Every structure is written in structure tokens, then in C-alpha cells.
Amino acid sequence: MARIAGVDLPNKKRMEYALTYIYGIGLHNSRLILNAVGIDFNKRAFELTEDEAAAIRKEIQENYMVEGDLRKKVAMDIKSLMDLGSYRGLRHRKGLPCRGQKTKTNARTRKGKKKTVGAATK
């Protein structure tokens, strides 16, 4: 099992899909990485030699922000929006959608479980 950027890649998957298990690398970036290193997309993860795995590690480390660093950057970006007091920051602080969706009936994922209001018993 190849371990790249702190993630164990699934052995049976083709490399172009196996690399997408790393946070911050999608299908497009995985194909760019494999092209840069010169590895066939159809090669399975268990078929990787140690040299090929090292080349992929080097390519990712030099050119991509992945896993913990990327998560930290996203969290810091959201925190800076909240500190600025921008509209998006306020929406993040309140736990509501930031991108203009309606919230009267939907947005249950962001708002959480329904809270019934005004239905008190006598």
C-alpha cells in the first residue's frame, strides 16, 4: 500500500483515482501530477515502484498544498472573513449558507435540526 502525503492509497484503484483520496487533489490535479512524473493513469497503486512513489511525493510536496496545510489555510481564510465582519463572515458565524441560497425552507444541512417555534401547549 503506497503512502503519499500521509494517506494510504487504495491498492486496487487506478492511480488517477487513488490520488484523489488525498485532500486537495481532485481528478484533474491527479492527472497533471501523473503526467509530470510520467506514470501511466491505468497503473494500479500496488504496482508502483518505490522510485515512482517518491517522484509523486516530491511533485506533490513541491507544487501542491494538500491535507493539513490546506485544511489550516481554509480554516484561517474563514476565520479572517469572520474577523473582518464581512457578509460572508457573518453568515459563517451564524451557521447559514454564504452563497445566496434561500433559507426560508431549505438549508437544513447548515441550520441543523428544526426548532419548532410558537407551538406551546395550554
Swiss-Prot record:
One of its GO terms (biological process) is translation. Belongs to the universal ribosomal protein uS13 family. Transmembrane segments: none annotated. The gene is rpsM. Keywords: Ribonucleoprotein, Ribosomal protein, RNA-binding, rRNA-binding, tRNA-binding. InterPro entries: Rbsml_uS13_C, Ribosomal_uS13, Ribosomal_uS13-like_H2TH, Ribosomal_uS13_bac-type, Ribosomal_uS13_CS. One of its GO terms (molecular function) is rRNA binding. The keyword tRNA-binding applies. This is Small ribosomal subunit protein uS13. Part of the 30S ribosomal subunit. Forms a loose heterodimer with protein S19. Forms two bridges to the 50S subunit in the 70S ribosome. Residues 95-122 are annotated as: Disordered. Coiled coil: none annotated. SUPFAM superfamilies: S13-like H2TH domain. It comes from the Bacteria. GO terms for cellular component: cytosol; small ribosomal subunit. Located at the top of the head of the 30S subunit, it contacts several helices of the 16S rRNA. In the 70S ribosome it contacts the 23S rRNA (bridge B1a) and protein L5 of the 50S subunit (bridge B1b), connecting the 2 subunits; these bridges are implicated in subunit movement. Contacts the tRNAs in the A and P-sites. Residues 95-116 have a biased composition (Basic residues). PROSITE patterns: RIBOSOMAL_S13_1, RIBOSOMAL_S13_2.
